[in-house]
């Protein structure tokens, strides 16, 4: 306790010397720290239910080779990924997305998966919210099999495509390092793709005490030296079993577990975690806490072939849950609210179209429903650059549904008796629309195609 008190005292004095200044990044809050939760769909849902709150940010993953986990369920033993489902479940939360290279960073850099990159960017860009894209997350983690040159080339390509496709306002690029204690110091520069293409520096925070916080401090200093905001993209009290109140010093197999009190666990891991934020308050602008029962997910479970992780769910121990809630009640932590997106520097993209569309379409249509609006599968004009595709519900089981424009598909939302989804489009252009829906009482699924010319019709 004396050592911790000394560390807090010195760090607090040092923090007072920091001067507020503008950081070079995108979707960076002027004040405060974004609080997000991960990292699989069901763990996020469990946290939200147990804590009685909507997370300000939610985290999930996708593989670039097959886009597994983007719009369909994917579980590689670390919990279920489905970014579209998660985004629809939390429509007013920021989205933090980790993209795996699936061990093929060279082919990614060579352009083999450029079409998948574009699909990913368009899907994320269509969500009306701040998106933090952790491209090739934990870039220097040896388990990922990355090489420096291909990694940097792919990072620069994605940054450029975000701008070319028109989504620079809501997709921010995060360069995340592993902060892994066994890695040698002084290597970050070899992985750096350039100040001009990095919006945030990210790090992982699991067991930094194993190397006296050297690796996380190195990452923080790298962000500071490049004037970039810092995001703790992955954090969890590794080797602690919160439900069982135990800790193991064995990172490989979790042997010789020691009994801990709830107060000990809080003081040993959580207090230094939040103190790290104090120490770096000049640059630290976001964190993601992985709130999961790692031991119940087969990738992390016994015999612990990928190391021993434990159980990090804060809700399972009343004392830890209370301390967590008390800590996050500090106004410096950005929680979910109606002002969340504005706090993150993201504007309301709906502001300019509503009145104009109403006037233009009312005049053109003469106040009457256009003749071609009688079709159940149709579209509405939103703006000269946005089309809403919809299909009237015909009583399908509809456990899933997708609306597509030129074979670019997104999960639809059901409202007022119809499934709908908006897409970027150009007025006057011809498009192929497709609707796919589960139909367990019929043929298993229905697939309906239609070719249309995008006009300023408004059908509903």
From Swiss-Prot:
Q: Give the species.
A: Vibrio sp
Identify the residues that the record assigns to the GH26 domain, covering every copy. Answer: 23-337
What's an example GO BP annotation here?
Answer: substituted mannan metabolic process
The recorded induction information for this protein reads: By beta-1,3-xylan.
The protein, known as: Beta-1,3-xylanase TXYA
GO MF annotation list: mannan endo-1,4-beta-mannosidase activity; polysaccharide binding; xylan 1,3-beta-xylosidase activity; xylan endo-1,3-beta-xylosidase activity
Q: Which residues form a coiled coil?
A: none
Q: Which InterPro entries match?
A: Beta-xylanase, Beta-xylanase_CBM31_sf, GH26_dom, Glyco_hydro_26, Glycoside_hydrolase_SF
Composition bias type Gly residues, residue spans: 348-366
One Pfam family for this entry, by name?
AlcCBM31
Q: How is its activity regulated?
A: Completely inhibited by Cu(2+), Hg(2+) and N-bromosuccinimide. Strongly inhibited by Ag(+), Zn(2+) and Pb(2+). Moderately inhibited by Fe(3+), Al(3+), Mn(2+), dithiothreitol and p-chloromercuribenzoic acid. Slightly activated by Mg(2+) and Ca(2+). Unaffected by Na(+), K(+), Ba(2+), EDTA, iodoacetic acid and N-ethylmalaimide.
UniProt-listed Enzyme Commission number(s)? 3.2.1.32
